[in-house]
Every structure is written in structure tokens, then in C-alpha cells.
Amino acid sequence: MIREERLLKVLRAPHVSEKASMAMEKNNTIVLKVATDATKAEIKAAVKKLFEVEVDTVRTLVVKGKVKRHGQRIGRRSDWKKAYVTLKEGQNLDFIGGAE
């Protein structure tokens, strides 16, 4: 069993993009920014506990940070992990909450 403190640290934020909103509409999939050391099992448990929905599958990828310049200085943004969480049929989760 995964401790509750760990579950709260696994999920960082929803990832809002055009592709993410299309995935939510078509495939009942939510896109989340998660901790880089989070496993698929931890992500599934965290979504299930925090949002009280049934999870079907979890797919993850690591987004590599871009090299950016500020004047002459060259820096690099941090790598981060993204998770595509597909909910089971009949489950619904509305992050954006459009006007009704």
C-alpha cells in the first residue's frame, strides 16, 4: 500500500493543451504533470484516491527540458514527466470546467 503523503506528491498539475483537451473529449483521457520518479502504479492509485474515479490505463513519458538563452547566458529547463490516464467507461472528470 502506498502512503497517502506520497500519493499527494505524485500528481503535480493538469497539463492543459489543445491535444490534452482533444484526448479528454475523444478518449476519456486526462493528461497530468507528475513527479519524475512516479511509477504508473503510484499514478493510478493517486488518481483513484484523490478524484474517486476508476482508472483503466496509465501511459507515461518524460518531456526533455529545452535549452533557453537569457542574454548571453545559456540555461536549460528541467525535464518533467507527463502521464496520460485513461478512465474506465462511464467515468468522468472535468478539470477545466467550462461555462454552462
From Swiss-Prot:
GO cellular-component term (any): ribonucleoprotein complex
Domain of life of the source: Bacteria
Annotated signal peptide: none
InterPro entries hit by this protein: Nucleotide-bd_a/b_plait_sf, Ribosomal_uL23-like, Ribosomal_uL23/eL15/eS24_sf, Ribosomal_uL23_CS
Protein's UniProt keywords contain Ribosomal protein: yes
Pfam families: Ribosomal_L23
This protein's UniProt keywords: Ribonucleoprotein, Ribosomal protein, RNA-binding, rRNA-binding
GO BP: translation
Keyword presence, Ribonucleoprotein: yes
SUPFAM superfamilies in the cross-refs: Ribosomal proteins S24e, L23 and L15e
GO terms, molecular function: rRNA binding; structural constituent of ribosome
Residue pairs linked by disulfide bridges in the UniProt entry: none
Gene3D superfamilies: 3.30.70.330
PROSITE patterns hit by this protein: RIBOSOMAL_L23 (PS00050)
Purpose of the protein: One of the early assembly proteins it binds 23S rRNA. One of the proteins that surrounds the polypeptide exit tunnel on the outside of the ribosome. Forms the main docking site for trigger factor binding to the ribosome.
UniProt similarity note: Belongs to the universal ribosomal protein uL23 family.
Quaternary context: Part of the 50S ribosomal subunit. Contacts protein L29, and trigger factor when it is bound to the ribosome.
Protein name in UniProt: Large ribosomal subunit protein uL23
Organism of derivation: Edwardsiella ictaluri (strain 93-146)
Underlying gene: rplW
